Swiss-Prot record:
It is an enzyme of class 2 (transferase). The keyword Nucleotidyltransferase applies. It comes from the Bacteria. It catalyses: sulfate + ATP + H(+) = adenosine 5'-phosphosulfate + diphosphate. It comes from Parabacteroides distasonis (strain ATCC 8503 / DSM 20701 / CIP 104284 / JCM 5825 / NCTC 11152). One of its GO terms (biological process) is sulfate assimilation. Belongs to the PAPS reductase family. CysD subfamily. Heterodimer composed of CysD, the smaller subunit, and CysN. With CysN forms the ATP sulfurylase (ATPS) that catalyzes the adenylation of sulfate producing adenosine 5'-phosphosulfate (APS) and diphosphate, the first enzymatic step in sulfur assimilation pathway. APS synthesis involves the formation of a high-energy phosphoric-sulfuric acid anhydride bond driven by GTP hydrolysis by CysN coupled to ATP hydrolysis by CysD. InterPro entries: PAPS_reduct_dom, Rossmann-like_a/b/a_fold, SO4_adenylTrfase_ssu, Sulfate_adenylyltrnsfr_sub2. GO terms for molecular function: ATP binding; sulfate adenylyltransferase (ATP) activity. This is Sulfate adenylyltransferase subunit 2.
Amino acid sequence: MSDYKLSHLQELEAESIHIIREVAAEFENPVMLYSIGKDSSVMVRLAEKAFAPGKVPFPLMHIDSKWKFKEMIEFRDSYAKKFGWNLIVESNMEAFHAGVGPFTHGSKVHTDLMKTQALLHALDKYKFDAAFGGARRDEEKSRAKERIFSFRDKFHQWDPKNQRPELWDIYNARVHKGESIRVFPLSNWTELDIWQYIRLENIPIVPLYFAKERPCVEIDGNLIMADDDRLPEQYRDQIRMRMVRFRTLGCWPLTGAVESEADTIEKIVEEMMTTTKSERTTRVIDFDQDASMEQKKREGYF
């Protein structure tokens, strides 16, 4: 009898598929949060595999802050149409029409109103009792200590000091009416794992991940790509073409690029082999206050 062994990526894939199926079986109305990034793209592929050849039994939902890169929105719409996903797009239009943005109100207020509050409103609107997210434990310290099945109270708040025990692959999906669970099937993946899986599965991703000459301006130590005409006048004469790519994607004024020559998946994987910094070091919102990400998650952020 031959030995049956799984590779490292196959083990991660099997664990994630098990988690996704568990949620579909345990919850009445789950949703998969779709940020359009590399992790979301992997999570979507895993969901498709989990229920193939059938249709995935829950929708995708994107919280659009109205400040995403243009290429992200184009990719989102074409991907959902090509693969037949039920895509929900929600935004805080009241705050948007009031002129809320990262340049005028700062990253903290912008993130709270355009992302956190928009998310909480959408979860209540559709009465979702479970929401998949693409966060990984290697990204950031508050995410490192969060459970795979992360309990939220009726206000969608997370209490890191009151988390449920999670032994092996046994998950507690019980909630009372109004409570919910955030589920992170990629918790045990690393950034390198993500890229190797993208290469293995030939998963389509936003072109911003690949190095290219792009118009950038340095703001507070970050290389910010000038993606549209909302860049303040004071920075416009500082724009320079730089060979850059993005390790993580978000609102363009709050997401720093990294100088890189990696214009293929293979080169990105090679780059990941030697990097010593988390991709979150280029996200402005992670540093706008002490323990920034943990505080945002307590308030209901992704």
